[in-house]
């Protein structure tokens, strides 16, 4: 019974995916920006690897900014320090 349910699900998923390919066309993935090395004593901003906002940065980047520059992201509050 599980096999039948699984096969029906996979078949319906394949049909949906085929429809999306023809509707939306192929889109390439958006490349990530290159890593920018920090400038010692430089301003806090995108040039030293720590963006001005906490949005859209990875966990490892946020942790790095917190340990190196004391700019720590907090949920709902943004940077502190």
Curated annotation (Swiss-Prot):
- Tissue spec: Higher expression in hemocytes and to a lesser extent in heart, testis, gills, intestine, lymphoid organ and hepatopancreas. Traces in eyes and subcuticular epithelium. Not present in the brain.
Which residues constitute the signal peptide according to the record?
Answer: 1-19
Q: Where in the cell is it found?
A: Cytoplasmic granule
| Keyword set, alphabetical order | Amidation, Antibiotic, Antimicrobial, Chitin-binding, Disulfide bond, Fungicide, Pyrrolidone carboxylic acid, Signal
- Family under the similarity heading: Belongs to the penaeidin family.
Purpose: Antibacterial activity against M.luteus and E.coli bacteria. Antifungal activity against N.crassa and F.oxysporum. Presents chitin-binding activity.
Know the name of this protein?
Penaeidin-3c
């Amino acid at each position: 019974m599980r096999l039948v349910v699984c096969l029906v699900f996979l078949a319906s998923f394949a049909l949906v995916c085929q429809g999306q390919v023809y509707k939306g066309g192929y889109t390439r993935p958006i490349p990530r920006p290159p890593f920018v090395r920090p400038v010692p004593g430089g301003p806090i901003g995108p040039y030293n690897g720590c963006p001005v906002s906490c949005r859209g940065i990875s966990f490892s980047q946020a942790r790095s900014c917190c340990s190196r520059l004391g700019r720590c992201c907090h949920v709902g509050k943004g940077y502190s320090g």
